[in-house]
Amino acid sequence: MNRWARWPLIILIGILGISAVVILSSLASVDYLINIWWFDSLGYGLYYWLRLLYRYIVFGAVTLLFFLIFFLNFWVASRYVGNVPPAPSKFRIAALDRYLNVVRMFRSGSLWVYTPLSLILAVIIALPIFEKWEAFLLYVAGPKTGVPDPVYGKDISYYLFSYPIYTLVQRRLLIAFVLLLVGLVALYLLERRLLARQEQPIPAGARLHLSILILLIFLIETWDYVLQRYELLYSEAHMPLFYGGGFVEMYVIWALIWLTLFFLMGTAFSMIAFIQTRKGLKPLVVFAVGFVLVLGLRYSAFLPATVEKLVVKPNEVSRERDFIVNNIKATLSAYNLNTVQTRDFTPARTAADVASPKVKAQLRNIPVWDGELLDDVYKQLQQLRTYYTFPSVDVARYTVNGMPQQVFLSVRELDYTLIPEAARNWVNEHLSYTHGYGAVMTPASQGGDEPMTWFIKGIPPESEYGFRIEQPGVYIGLGSYTYVIAPNDAGEIDYPKGNSNTMVSYKAEDGVPLSSFLRRILFAYHFGDRNLLFTTKTTPDSKILFRRNLLERIRVLTPFLLLDGDPYAVVTPGKLYWIQDAYTTSEFYPGATPTLWGRDRFNYIRNSVKIVVDAFSGKVEYYVFEPGDPIVRAYSRIYPGVFRNADQMPPELKAQVRYPQDIFEIQMNIYAKYQQTDPEVYYQQEDMWEPAKTFQDRTPVTIKPYYVTLDLIDPSRFDFLLLAPMSPKGRDNLRALALAGSDPPHYGKIIVYNFPKGELIYGPSQIYALINQDTRISEQFTLWDQVGSQVARGKMIILPISNMILYIQPVYLKSATKLKIPELKRIIMSQGQIVVMEPSLEEAYAKLQERIKLEIDRVDKRFAPLLPGSPAGR
């Protein structure tokens, strides 16, 4: 094998060697080793290696591509340097020696110069692509959706997976070839200046090389203009009316893009012809001038503004109709709202009998407790030790005594910061106080002046209603947890018992074994804690448990999933579990209006994944609940074995799955505008909605979706569902009630009950004002305040019961002393202008029923038809 034939092999081996060194040095770092051990302890060792491998495969492949682009072009250019030697008669001996040295440097030494230079440039160009390595995987693995976009007819998967990669690659290729062209032109000019050969023409091969590069640059720029056609689908020029391309974009800008392409290609071929033949300057000038003029029109605001003013504005509805329709359809599809079912709801004048079995069933599950106030009750009555806390209160439904019952549930977690200062030491923090214990559960519905009913209470957990938790330890939760070592010789405090503590030794899958002194050294370095290295309280079975916060654990495992803000606990006969909803999102759904949610911006979202985390062992499992979502299908292909089908979820967990509040809130914010599917109605925005508002402590607040158990989906059964009251934009009355089912077979089904447009349905803020105006209620509040109690009004909920719209607000009393245990005292219930306040839901409903009948009788008597013969009847 000659010297030149060996060079490609040497270069390839060199690149692979450098990549191997980078990978091995990364793996040798402490963080990588700890991650490998941690992922492996959870059963995701192969998945972690795949993520590492994919990352470096993408980086290596892209770097190699750009390296070859740079190196081969530099190498070809070096062949033409000195290809035409200078005439000896015109040069001194010194000049000839200089010429030969330069030629030798660029030819023989070029491999030593161009190889590192090409590698450096390739890495610089490839780095932004490396940061998007997972998008490349989605591009490769993304499936077809079978849904074309209405403008270009391309499958939606093109926009979700291909378009973002094409735009990124196009920009990097353009930068690479422009740098290359500048470098090669400089190289050829350098040769001519060093050798004083300006009178000699550039070699034909060099001209051909430069011509090809120029053509490639023009082709890459042409690709950019082709991609700009699709970019029009993401135009924000017409916001806030509609999103995406409008008349100006799809007719004027679209035509200018094609004209730009025409003149660009004409300029490219004219320039190459001129470089090769020194002829054809006139066509080059014509095409170049045309390109500049059209480009100016393309990016100038003059022509679009003129067309908008003279053509579009006078007939805006007709001109923009098709584009408004495209935006409506795309947005509803992107947010999974294209299958929303609408129903009419006409409120009845009279209330059904409170003795009716159906009314009783509806009242038994109305959540009258406010989660925030209930949290104070749990902490005061069930915290039991200073170091326990209840981070959040969840809404759920369970079967109690054979009947479906909506409940509130909270996990008793450990909070080390609550331990007295004198007891805070390394042993207690990392060896003894390792976990929380058990949970509490109460019914959502309860009467005032009644003692709290506890479905689950105490330590150890006990229940008179059939609930049991065999393993109540909580090592994974919502709190901020430090690392712990378990089991250990110091002993873990399992739960308090009398004046002492019951001890336990941890036995579960979670945790990285501290099986060697080297591991202790590495973990001590990682956590910056030398006590971990020198402690004598470990055993051969000791493991180190870290990343015990639920959200942190999931985000480290699957950073590509967007997490819901409300993970919730599940009680099973065996253990406590957490269920975390996760979303797949994209900001490239064509023509769909984007949403800003926290720091995330997207215009496509699916609640594709339910994540189950064992609160004791820390085991994490992923279940796909949206198998039609192309993004989660792509991830399932990329990471085989990570995602499971929903039917593989254990029945006791699947029974507790619920439709998440965050995505429903996002959907309703979108639907409030895009339920106007008629383009003319949409253009006028005459029926735009917004979430209903009320007052909380005299502060206006938006009512967020809340969970209730009602028969609104199927009249023959009660479903656990989310309810969101909607009002007309800028108004206080109600316009609709939107709901989303959580129980199979109606899971995820969204139904919107529309109220008659011509009928006033009171909104929650109006009911709030009516309550304040009720003299009997105000007098009672004043009386309670005078006896040293504080009156607290809970969140108002709106419920359709027996064809009536009821407004329910609980009233609590809190002691004015430091020890504040909220007590549910009364239930305020209203139907329109009639407001009552009674100790229980049943009593309030009965009282409301009585008041409604009296009001109907009063109105009927006052406006009864006059008797024949009366003075007014003559």
Curated annotation (Swiss-Prot):
Its main location: membrane. It is a multi-pass membrane protein. One of its GO terms (cellular component) is extracellular region. Pfam families: UPF0182 (PF03699). Keywords: Cell membrane, Membrane, Transmembrane, Transmembrane helix. It is found in: Cell membrane. InterPro entries: UPF0182. The chain crosses the membrane at residues 7-27, 57-77, 110-130, 171-191, 208-228, 252-272, 283-303. Belongs to the UPF0182 family. This is UPF0182 protein Sfum_2137. It comes from Syntrophobacter fumaroxidans (strain DSM 10017 / MPOB).
